[in-house]
Amino acid sequence: PWSFQNPVALVFDEYDAGRSDVMFVLQRILESDGYFTLLDRNKVVKQNSYFRLFATANTIGLGDTTGLYTGTQQINQAQLDRWEIVTSLNYLSSDNEMNIVLAKNKQLNNIKGKERVSNMIKVASLTRKGFVSGDISTVMSPRTVLNWCNNSEIFKDVGYAFRVTFLNKCDNSEKNIIAEY
């Protein structure tokens, strides 16, 4: 109730992994009239006019039919209807991804390091295109690129780091396709 009554931006990460009993409580918060009843306290609280609620979901609330996001649930259509704005985010541009990787790996912020990171991002982009086209079933996220960079620093071997960070997660039948990237 505290966040609801204050100028807070509340973010529910992996919203579609929420339990249905919790989701029904949240449904009332999504109503536009700005009131919420605390039954255990016999009290009605009013929403702060600057309170904002955000959520992230890999399945956009439609559930997972692919098996990629095990543990997610289909969100009740009435609740999905209460979200006034729903949007999709694509992957970052190569430049933005580069900036994030370099910010987390300052030792790579030099000509040689930038070239290595640029090549890693190109490989990641190829896996994303392969995933979208249905050629491969595992995608390299920006988090995976960060892990690949970290592991390449640990092992001092970009190829080995690629295998332990990404390739070992892939289906054996797809490894030849990935090798072409």
Language-model segments: which ranges?
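C-terminal regulatory/interaction module of P-loop NTP-utilizing enzymes
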Residues: 1-181
